[in-house]
Design a protein with these regions (language model features):
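Non-catalytic connector elements of ABC transporters
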Residues: 92-96, 104-214
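ABC ATPase nucleotide-binding domains
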Residues: 1-84
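Residue-level detector of alpha-helical recognition elements and their boundaries
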Residues: 30-31, 46, 67, 80, ...
């Protein structure tokens, strides 16, 4: 009914919150089609990060009334400004591990992972080599197969099959990590697997401020 007015700007405050899951998916597509057809500005308020990622051309992420980051969906996903944004955007959420830098390695009491030269140079430039930091890595950037380096043994606590893929909830050296894996292989709770960290895709955050180190 509001769209009939042909306004310059439309404000939609969680319009799909009372719909069931299937209808929400359908209506997301319909609203996106309307946006393209009307070629007007729509300010869409939502607590559902999936709605934000799939519908927006630009996302404003807020916490406690304060803007955390503004950007295109892909930018916000790939270059989160801080740990709040990194943990909010993406499902399952980004994995976080607290540690320090030792030479060219990110280390905890139980893990040791080699950092690519480009990312190590940024950490050096920002003076982060001798400070506690947090490494973030998304579930799709941890792979259930062995490579030349950055391989760790993990134990599966829960294996969720979603159809085309598995969500593996694992324990790795005392850390709880989620791994996104293809469904070509079967995975089971209690199984031990080797996982590979794609460190070219990792993110680093200041442990105190939680701001991304870039």
């Amino acid at each position: 009914r509001a769209i009939v007015r042909e306004a310059g700007v439309f404000l939609m405050d969680e319009p799909l919150s009372n719909l069931d899951a299937k209808l929400r998916v359908q209506m997301r597509a319909e609203i996106s089609k309307l946006h393209q057809k009307l070629n007007t500005t729509m300010i869409y308020v939502t607590h559902d990060q999936t709605e934000a990622m799939t519908m927006a051309t630009r996302i404003v992420i807020m916490k406690d009334g304060i803007v955390q980051q503004v950007g295109a969906p892909k930018t916000v996903y790939n270059q989160p400004a801080n740990m709040f944004v990194a943990g909010f955007i993406g499902s399952p959420a980004m994995n976080f591990i607290r540690g320090t830098i030792d030479g060219d390695k990110f280390v905890t009491e139980t893990l040791k992972l080699t950092i690519p030269e480009e990312k190590l140079a940024v950490l050096k430039t920002q003076g982060s080599l001798h400070k506690p930091i947090v490494m973030g890595i998304r579930p799709e950037d941890i792979h259930p197969d062995a490579q030349e380096e950055n391989n760790i043994s993990a134990k599966i606590s829960v294996a969720e099959l979603t159809g085309a893929e598995f969500m593996l909830y694992t324990t790795v050296g005392g850390h709880e990590l989620v791994v996104r894996a293809g469904a070509l292989n079967d995975y089971h709770a209690g199984e031990n697997i080797t996982i590979h960290f794609d460190m070219t895709k990792c993110h680093f955050f200041d442990a105190e401020t939680e701001i991304a180190i870039r």
